[in-house]
């Protein structure tokens, strides 16, 4: 299992053109909304969506389900305020935790006008698996189309607060630019298909 995961890690810097088939169609979502509570789903309506913020879990090897359950459990532990609208898992699965029109506690002052995506990663590098990366591109592109955004409206948690998140995309600027290019390509592919 570990070998499979290690071999499936996407080398962001070199994979720029390998996601040409990814488009901005709605991905398969496992909707598991958090209970409304003051620690992870306050039930506050967003002020409008002006961007998509990418995060990483900073918890190597944890699954999307484990992260979703952690967010939901904050209503009991009351240890912090944290959540995201979506979590992309190690196998590319996507769990929706908070509706896109509601605030998630992920991006500080940008909580009120962005959608947040938390991304699972197999190891300390913060690099994503191929399956995770492909789902992240599709989900991000779909959200951009849904809210009339472009890849230029996609930011890292780092761009809001200076926090090293998502780690791999902060430490490898070329990988971040390649990701945004992949998102832009997926958006344009879908727009071209709808015009035909």
Give the positions of each predicted feature:
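Sec-dependent N-terminal signal peptides
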Residues: 1-3
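Active-site-proximal helix/loop segments of hydrolytic enzymes
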Residues: 78, 85, 89, 122, ...
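Extracytoplasmic/periplasmic, Sec-exported soluble proteins
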Residues: 44-46, 78-79, 105-109, 124-135, ...
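Catalytic nucleophile-His microenvironment captured as a short glycine-rich beta-strand/loop
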Residues: 83-88, 115-121, 144
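Basic/polar, cationic surfaces and motifs that engage anionic cell-wall
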Residues: 12-29, 123-196
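Hydrophobic faces of well-ordered beta-strands that scaffold small-molecule active sites
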Residues: 54, 115, 154-156
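N-terminal catalytic cores of peptidoglycan-degrading enzymes
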Residues: 7-107
């Amino acid at each position: 299992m570990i070998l499979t995961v290690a071999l499936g890690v996407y080398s962001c810097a070199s994979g720029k053109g390998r996601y040409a088939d990814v488009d901005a169609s709605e991905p398969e979502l496992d909707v598991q909304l958090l209970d409304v509570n003051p620690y992870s789903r306050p039930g506050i309506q967003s002020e409008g969506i002006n961007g998509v913020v990418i995060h990483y879990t900073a918890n190597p090897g944890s699954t999307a389900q484990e992260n979703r359950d952690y967010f939901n459990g904050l209503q009991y532990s009351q240890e912090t305020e944290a959540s995201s609208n979506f979590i992309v898992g190690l196998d590319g699965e996507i769990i929706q935790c908070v509706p896109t029109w509601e605030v998630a506690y992920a991006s500080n002052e940008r909580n009120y006008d962005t959608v947040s995506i938390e991304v699972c990663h197999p190891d300390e590098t913060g690099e994503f698996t191929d399956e995770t990366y492909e789902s992240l591109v599709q989900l991000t592109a779909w959200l951009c189309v849904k809210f009339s955004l472009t890849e230029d409206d996609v930011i890292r948690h780092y761009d809001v607060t200076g926090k090293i998140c998502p780690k791999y995309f902060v430490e490898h600027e070329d990988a971040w630019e390649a990701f945004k290019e992949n998102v832009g390509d997926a958006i344009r592919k879908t727009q071209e298909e709808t015009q035909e």
